[in-house]
Amino acid sequence: MDAATTRVGLTDLTFRLLRESFADAVSWVAKNLPARPAVPVLSGVLLTGSDNGLTISGFDYEVSAEAQVGAEIVSPGSVLVSGRLLSDITRALPNKPVDVHVEGNRVALTCGNARFSLPTMPVEDYPTLPTLPEETGLLPAELFAEAISQVAIAAGRDDTLPMLTGIRVEILGETVVLAATDRFRLAVRELKWSASSPDIEAAVLVPAKTLAEAAKAGIGGSDVRLSLGTGPGVGKDGLLGISGNGKRSTTRLLDAEFPKFRQLLPTEHTAVATMDVAELIEAIKLVALVADRGAQVRMEFADGSVRLSAGADDVGRAEEDLVVDYAGEPLTIAFNPTYLTDGLSSLRSERVSFGFTTAGKPALLRPVSGDDRPVAGLNGNGPFPAVSTDYVYLLMPVRLPG
């Protein structure tokens, strides 16, 4: 599905297709187009009609996206038009068939009684999209979207620290581990997939923004295929390919060293607590109303209860008490409310388990499963061994006043 190989008849492309499928494909490709492209043609989407249907492509030298759409190709060819403009137009069109025809250096688009005439850009100046590396493995689309969203939330956004803007992807046979950190929190997700080879082994760093967009926009279909190569050449192309359901994208890998994260995960806790996620999120939002942006929310844990509080005398104070299953000595700890709610929302669980060491060390959040031993059944005041789970969110506390 390489659009570059089918650029023929550059001035006579004519096709008809359904508005919904056209709008979906154009929008998906246009999402990754640069707002300020280095050269004008990179703001365009390439429409290529052939015997295989319509191919819609976008590329900015870092990220490529390509979607195959069923269409009635009256006359094959290619045309390059503004991606943002075409996306806006196709999403606003009535739900009727769309006719597209290239007329000289303009493209005519008709849908119902609506007609548009758009300028084109030189197809010959458009770069060739990269070829996908060999397929490395596949996993269900829903699992891919969930896992990426769970770890991308913890990735950094400071481009001066590229090692923190990526998601580390570790592959060991049928097991994949995803990890991301911005130094204030760390998210790790482990999952199983169908590897192309049982002995495949690789570790790469992928831009979190690109993976998050891919997960959010969705490839669709039942499976997502990841392509990094096979054998000893895994990751050597410097590209990750993601494909499925007629869509494919590539992104350049980050050439940076991800922090050694496993040594940060505690193996035991001095105190543990479990509580309702939705109830806790609502309480955090409530008390944080009197906290300055990014200010702390304090949590005072004792047997059977936790008190959330925020604010100060000059801006106002707020507190709320919640029921909690707690084991360990009484503990007061504070967190950034945004980072805390991010972690709670990413658990995909009705209840959360907190594992604590001290008020000055990171807390470990994990989803509570039906196999969990009740906190009330734990003896003594610790230490309590960390429970193995497929997702953890490690969060640095905020220094308490005084």
UniProtKB/Swiss-Prot annotation:
Keywords: Antibiotic resistance, Cytoplasm, DNA replication, DNA-binding, DNA-directed DNA polymerase, Nucleotidyltransferase, Transferase. The keyword Lyase does not apply. GO terms for biological process: DNA strand elongation involved in DNA replication; response to antibiotic. GO terms for molecular function: 3'-5' exonuclease activity; DNA binding; DNA-directed DNA polymerase activity; identical protein binding. It is found in: Cytoplasm. Pfam families: DNA_pol3_beta, DNA_pol3_beta_2, DNA_pol3_beta_3. InterPro entries: DNA_clamp_sf (IPR046938), DNA_polIII_beta (IPR001001), DNA_polIII_beta_C (IPR022635), DNA_polIII_beta_cen (IPR022637), DNA_polIII_beta_N (IPR022634). Transmembrane segments: none annotated. Gene3D superfamilies: DNA Polymerase III, subunit A, domain 2. Its main location: cytoplasm. SUPFAM superfamilies: DNA clamp. Forms a ring-shaped head-to-tail homodimer around DNA which binds and tethers DNA polymerases and other proteins to the DNA. The DNA replisome complex has a single clamp-loading complex (3 tau and 1 each of delta, delta', psi and chi subunits) which binds 3 Pol III cores (1 core on the leading strand and 2 on the lagging strand) each with a beta sliding clamp dimer. Additional proteins in the replisome are other copies of gamma, psi and chi, Ssb, DNA helicase and RNA primase. Interacts with the tau/gamma subunit (dnaX). Strains that are resistant to griselimycin occur at a very low frequency and are associated with amplification of a 10.3 kb chromosomal segment containing this gene as well as the ori site, suggesting antibiotic resistance may be due to overexpression of the wild-type protein. Confers DNA tethering and processivity to DNA polymerases and other proteins. Acts as a clamp, forming a ring around DNA (a reaction catalyzed by the clamp-loading complex) which diffuses in an ATP-independent manner freely and bidirectionally along dsDNA. Initially characterized for its ability to contact the catalytic subunit of DNA polymerase III (Pol III), a complex, multichain enzyme responsible for most of the replicative synthesis in bacteria; Pol III exhibits 3'-5' exonuclease proofreading activity. Belongs to the beta sliding clamp family. This is Beta sliding clamp. The lineage of its organism: Bacteria, Bacillati, Actinomycetota, Actinomycetes, Mycobacteriales.
